[in-house]
Amino acid sequence: MLQLLLAVFIGGGTGSVARWLLSMRFNPLHQAIPLGTLTANLIGAFIIGMGFAWFSRMTNIDPVWKVLITTGFCGGLTTFSTFSAEVVFLLQEGRFGWTLLNVFVNLLGSFAMTALAFWLFSASTAH
């Protein structure tokens, strides 16, 4: 149990630092859409899709790696709370079109990245 807790802790910290770095780098590039949050969510969605595909086929993988990558790293990297706050800020500024675009791209983009990664990894390990 302690190993699992440490894996979540290490993965979560690493994912959170990665999200912060992405926000610092990409959020200033566009005033209306926080590109750092979008990038973090899309990357996290891809990684978790790849992870689930990999873990479903490689059943002998240590559970520590599973929680390090999924619950830890992806949990720290992706963020629904920041996304929600940014949507509210856009609404408060009256940027309704940008709000809808931001919600659409974050949600559908994340679903698409998870499905793409799962499909790519499943196809590559089917042989």
UniProtKB/Swiss-Prot annotation:
Membrane topology: Multi-pass membrane protein
Keywords: Cell inner membrane, Cell membrane, Ion channel, Ion transport, Membrane, Metal-binding, Sodium, Transmembrane, Transmembrane helix, Transport
Record-level GO cellular component terms: plasma membrane
Keyword hit for RNA-binding: no
Highest taxon in the source lineage: Bacteria
Ways its activity is controlled: Na(+) is not transported, but it plays an essential structural role and its presence is essential for fluoride channel function.
Subcellular location: Cell inner membrane
GO biological process, one term: cellular detoxification of fluoride
Reaction equation(s) it catalyzes: fluoride(in) = fluoride(out)
Residues that, per the record, bind Na(+): G75, T78
InterPro entries per the UniProt record, alphabetical: FluC
GO molecular function, a single term: fluoride channel activity
Transmembrane spans: 4-24, 35-55, 71-91, 103-123
Similarity annotation: Belongs to the fluoride channel Fluc/FEX (TC 1.A.43) family.
HAMAP family linked: FluC
Function: Fluoride-specific ion channel. Important for reducing fluoride concentration in the cell, thus reducing its toxicity.
Protein name, as recorded: Fluoride-specific ion channel FluC
Organism: Escherichia coli O7:K1 (strain IAI39 / ExPEC)
Lineage of the species this protein comes from: Bacteria, Pseudomonadati, Pseudomonadota, Gammaproteobacteria, Enterobacterales
